Structure formats: C-alpha cells, structure tokens
Amino acid sequence: MAAPPARADADPSPTSPPTARDTPGRQAEKSETACEDRSNAESLDRLLPPVGTGRSPRKRTTSQCKSEPPLLRTSKRTIYTAGRPPWYNEHGTQSKEAFAIGLGGGSASGKTTVARMIIEALDVPWVVLLSMDSFYKVLTEQQQEQAAHNNFNFDHPDAFDFDLIISTLKKLKQGKSVKVPIYDFTTHSRKKDWKTLYGANVIIFEGIMAFADKTLLELLDMKIFVDTDSDIRLVRRLRRDISERGRDIEGVIKQYNKFVKPSFDQYIQPTMRLADIVVPRGSGNTVAIDLIVQHVHSQLEERELSVRAALASAHQCHPLPRTLSVLKSTPQVRGMHTIIRDKETSRDEFIFYSKRLMRLLIEHALSFLPFQDCVVQTPQGQDYAGKCYAGKQITGVSILRAGETMEPALRAVCKDVRIGTILIQTNQLTGEPELHYLRLPKDISDDHVILMDCTVSTGAAAMMAVRVLLDHDVPEDKIFLLSLLMAEMGVHSVAYAFPRVRIITTAVDKRVNDLFRIIPGIGNFGDRYFGTDAVPDGSDEEEVAYTG
C-alpha cells in the first residue's frame, strides 16, 4: 500500500489553537481577505457583489491574458521571466528535463495563488505557469446551448482535452516552445489567437483534474494537493465567476450544486492520495510553501550546467568541420580585416569597413540557399534559363547587441526579409550565457533562418540561439550561423552540437584566452561599433554583462 501524502501545516498559534473542524479553513480565509481588504471582518456577504447594483464589471473572461508581460509582480518585488541559463550540455542536447510541479485541488481552492507564492519564493527567473483552464474542449452547438443555461458539466474529466495537455507538457519539459489555447468563459470557446509559452527550468501545472490522467501523472515530478474548506471554495467561486467571468449568482449556485460539488466528491477528492504533499488552508500555509521551495531548489541544483567551461575543454585538435565556409581571403577582404582589427582605427572607419564586410558575408551566405531551375523571358522575347530561390521565406535573427549591426546588410540584399531578435548576455558571476529576451516572427519553422552575431568565441551564445530556433521547430539544416570573426573553439562547439547547421564567416582565429576573448581577435565589437565603454572581463560575443 502506498504511503499517505505528507501534510504540511502552518505553525500552530499558542493563543488560538484550532478547535473546530472548519477552523483551519477559516484561518486561511482570514489571511487571504486581510491581504486584500486590510480588514479582520469575516463575512460571506462581504465577499459577494451587492445584490442591487447589477452585474459587476467584467475583469477577465479568458483563461489567460494575451498581453501578459513576461514577469510576475508581487508585493515585494518584480520577478522577470528572463535570464534563462543554459538548458542543454556541450553537445547541444538537454541533459535533464525541466522540473514539473502539479497542483491539484477543488475549484477555487487557491491553486493559482499557491502557484504564484511558490514562484515568488523560488526566486528562479524562468518559470512557466500552465493552467488547465486553457484546455477545455471545443464545445458542439448542443453543448454550447447547455453551457449557456448552466447545464454543462465543466468539472468532469471529459470536459478537458487531455491529449493536448499531455503533448504540451511534454514539449515544455523538453525545453521547447508551445502554443497554448486561450479559453473564453463567456462564449465557452477558444479564442482564435493562441499564446506562446517558452521552455523553462520549472513548470507549474495547476488544475482541478491535474491528477486525473495516468500519463499526465507520470510527467509530474512533484504532486501537490491544495485542500481548502468547501464553504470557502464556494465563496471564492461565487466571487470569481460573478466578477471575472460575467456569470450571475443563480447560475453559479445551480452549477455548483449540480456539477461542481458532486464532481469534487467523485473525481477530485480521491486524487488527494496520489499527492506527494497536501497543503491544508492553501495560501495561508507558509510552512508548506517553504517545504516545497526547499525541495525544488535541491532539484534545480542537480540540474545546473556549466556549458562554457565544458566547451573550452572540448573538441581540441580536430580539423575544421565541413559545414564551415570561410569567405575567400582576397587582398580586399584581408585589407578590410587589417583596418577593423587595428586598435588605432577610428570609430567611423571601423563602422564603414565592418559594413562592407557584412555585405560580402551576406552575399556569400545566400549562395548556400536552395535554388531551382526556372525560365524567364527577356525584354527581347527570348527565354533565359536561370535560377530562383526554392524555399518558402528567409528570416534573419540577430543576437543582440552586436548581431543587430548586420541587419542593414541583410535587408539590402533580401527584399521583404523578416527580422527577429534574441538577447543573450553573460552572467558576470557565473560566466555562463543567459537568455533574456526573444522576439521571433510567426511560423518561422518553415523558413531558412540566417542567425547573425558579429563574433563567436566559445560558441556558448551561438549554441543557445540555435537551441532557441530548434525549440521553435526550425529544422537544423535550415539554420545558417553568420559571423564576421570566429574562434576555432566556437566553430568546433557549434558544429559538434549541431552538425547540420551551416557556419559562415569571413575569418577564423586560432585560440581564445582565459577571458574567452578571441586571439588575435577584433576586440569587443559592440563597444567599438556603438562607441560605448568596454566592459572589463567580458567576452567578444557577449557585449553587455548581466547585472541582475
């Protein structure tokens, strides 16, 4: 017989010990309402909208906000979902999956509140909160009619699209991006636009049926059941559905008595035995939150990776890969390299000759795109057998900051090219690259992608950028990595991890020093191009040190 789940309780109060069955639930409710109203009054009527004032203004009627920013604002601080450290090893593969936490419990038990408290206490920047509310099935016309009259059971396992939930969670655990539907509770349908979620170190999945599917259970590394008194859950549901989802009191109570309460007793309450931790009183139980956070921290420590150090010691004494193409070193190209490498070169000259090299590099890279035979007619009415681009579209993605300087050269030779950006910076404390921001065009998976960065030393930032593209389902053989200058170490690292990525540059230098600078190198390209002060101990490919 399986051991019963652990119950994490709050510190008992010496002055007011719990004496009644519903005391813990009331204590949690007091804690929650005190945060909202700064009042100790405990009245169910106070939590409901005034009867005579009509329906409350609708605040949010969908499962999630489409314009939700990539951050979590709390009473203490703002936690940005940025600065993600490497989620792969030196081979370019994910060595360990993300840590997935499942939060189950009855409707309005405080699962989302507990999830946000865990996120705040974790203080880990890359966390994804995935709500089961987004995965309600698309209703038929008959079911739509039933839902409009509060006669459809949304608290039954059949109401959820478990196939989509499982596939979404699997991709997130693999570090890939996913599309999540946005469910409209007023029309009981999915919105046309879906929200994009990106892979993270920690995934928190919450929902009333979080433990109702065996396959789903196997994906969860930690299972938490939020146990809240039924009266409190009813009050919270009334307040939420009336003020946020545009429902009326009679309809909410009818649905609760007919579907919600019976479904809780039949499907949700029995899953408590499957939980690793049971959290009584929900958000009021700080001891439980601390226990959960400590365990997650220990799991994350086991998943820490040091990619840059591994890259520096790997792939030594190997011949340059066949996927590398170096622009022919003509006297003109070598002359421009002489100018931009010279520390005495003025900023104006540095920019001018860098742009010339970029244009040549882009033109050279385009020759590796797929072309097919085509025939056109000349103005003289004669046929000409030529070539035309055989792909769907070309997209340029620049690794900020220095990679942005290559965008004008790409636009000059590729008409109507789409541009995306990725911000990767070095954490000055760990020396590891961190992903801070990305903006990619839609449907990028079918495009040939030109990834641009002006210098590549160890290849750590370039590998992270390639991983981002792969997580967006861009085929590896459709990615072209372009750089004005590379070190042999960076070339080997990228080619070994991603053997089908085409690497194109104007020159390859032999070595990298202890500060991960290319030798003889070009200096810090971003600082020389933009005229900013150099960052001590920074690398060529990471121009701005992380200060968070």
Curated annotation (Swiss-Prot):
Binding site for ATP: 105-112
PTM comment, free text: Ubiquitinated by RNF19B; which induces proteasomal degradation.
Subcellular location: Cytoplasm; Nucleus
Source organism of the structure: Homo sapiens (Human)
UniProt KW Metal-binding keyword: no
GO molecular function, one term: ATP binding
Protein name: Uridine-cytidine kinase-like 1
One Pfam entry name: UPRTase
